[in-house]
Amino acid sequence: MQYVESLFMPWNIDALVDGFTEDCVVRFGTVPEFRGREALHAFFAARSAKQKGYRLKKQFRTLVNDTLTNVWAGEWEDADTGVRMRGSGVEVWVMRGGRIALWEAAFNTGRADEVSSVADVLR
């Protein structure tokens, strides 16, 4: 997990993408499912442009056969607005040949200076 964290701080997009299979499948929150390293590279490039000063902490949770789970928390500055943001979530990685073949992620984000209620999240 620490190695993966290091690839986000600062962003090392080529190394991140190298950790995935050529035919990887990504299901990331409400982003429409996409496939392959080219689309993954574009996804990380878009995120790195938007998430200035990204700081990430991942914690390993489970490993069963070829499936690994982790939870994460992160903070960044929104590059467009300058607002400090935070996020947290859970990820499931299905591995093949030492690389991620399927990446599924669910997460919540919000302003770092605001506390969200259940009602806020459900809007």
Map each language-model feature to its residues:
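A beta-strand edge to alpha-helix "cap/lid" segment located at domain peripheries
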Residues: 27, 41-123
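An acidic, carboxylate-rich microenvironment
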Residues: 15, 38-39
